[in-house]
């Protein structure tokens, strides 16, 4: 699920500047300011998701988050011809909130699943999954510019949404698995 989420995020973050500038005519500064909506909502939503993981199963939070991210990315891909600033911002915010709802619970469940003496290895797995997703996402964007040069950014956003949706499905599958003891204690506290 981490690979899917980070692939989706990197693919979309590489595609969006091209999309906003080439398709809608935004300049560099406006594009940069618009894109801050994604990390800004992550800063607010990630700590909330961290608290919620003590109350709601991490699989449900992660699955819901990645589904929201997929919806935000699909909505970005199908922006109207002359979008208002708000049209772009709410879609970016939806993607960012979705990513935050996934990231904190996913990290919590992975670290809590490892025995204490293996927490360093679990953390390393998270980093490896993150970098794998980011690398594949960036490479996929380069490939799309080669294969569909006229429509690469929109295609990338749709592909990113599909990756997030795949991650969502896998995350929801965790609902059938027992929670790690550390999360059960936290939930019952």
Regions found by a protein language model. Give the residues of each.
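12-transmembrane solute porter fold
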Residues: 1-182
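Short, highly charged, low-complexity non-transmembrane loops/tails of multi-pass membrane proteins
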Residues: 183-189
